[in-house]
Each structure stands twice: as C-alpha cells, then as structure tokens.
C-alpha cells in the first residue's frame, strides 16, 4: 500500500511511469507581482504614508530604513503577522524572540527588491537617504498621492489590512538590530 504522507512523490512517480513530459508555455506564465516595480512602489507609498513621522515644522517625513524595509516586507506577506506579533510580545525573552526573528529574517534578508525600489525612488527624487533614515524627497508628495489614490479607489485591500494590523504591533529597535 502506498504511503499517504508523500502525495507529491506519488504524483511524480505516476507521471514518470506514464512518460509524461511537461510543456511550458511562457506566454501563459504570470510574473510575480512581488517583483513588479509599480506594485512595490505602491506598497512603499502605503507604508511610508502610514508610518513615517514628521520632521520638525517642515512638511518632510522620515522613517528608519530598517523599519520601512521590515514593514513593507510584512505588508507583502501578511501570513507572517502572527509570528511578528509573538516576536514583539516576547520582548527581551531572548530565546523565544530569537526563534521568531530567525524565521522572519531568513526571507527578509534575501529580499533585495525593496532596496532596488528605494534606490529607484531616491533617483527619482521621491525619497532621500539620510544616514539610517529614509526621508521624503523634493517630489515626495507623489508617494502621498499614490497612497491617497489607492485608498480612494479601495485598491490593495489585503495590503492595507496588513498595514492596519502592523499599526497594532510594536516594532522595537531590538527587533530591527542588525538589519
């Protein structure tokens, strides 16, 4: 009797027995939205609009670059929110917090698309880098308009929902260390 815990292996064996050959039609493959510059820009705009803080009496706003990267990473992956909440609630209980952070950091550290989008937005004048901070640039109002338009047209409901959940999770500096 075949083992029921290995359905993928069973399917692979059946396909091999029947001499099945995969056919890939590139025109029918959909690229992942996670690598789309416009999508990532929209997510950065939503996160920046919600979490960036005012800089003195100016209209400029800023956010820690590590915080922005973590928040947009989690916005794109809302299934990680329960783990982040547990990580945050664990506080300085290092063993418990470390276990949660390792699972999240594994994917987070290899996510270079965010860095590329931020570099693009800096080159366009939408954002500026200032030491460890990301600051709204001379054309930073464009990001605010993107976020406003997304909300007005009720787009990206999942992402906006994740951002609202993130607003209730305390992201500490300890959580951001080493990022």
Please report, for each region that a protein language model flagged, where it lies by residue.
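A glycine-rich, hydrophobic loop/mini-helix early in the fold
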Residues: 62-101
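Winged helix-turn-helix DNA-binding recognition segment
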Residues: 108, 126
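Accessory beta->alpha helical hairpin/"wing" motif in late/C-terminal subdomains of nucleic-acid enzymes
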Residues: 128-164
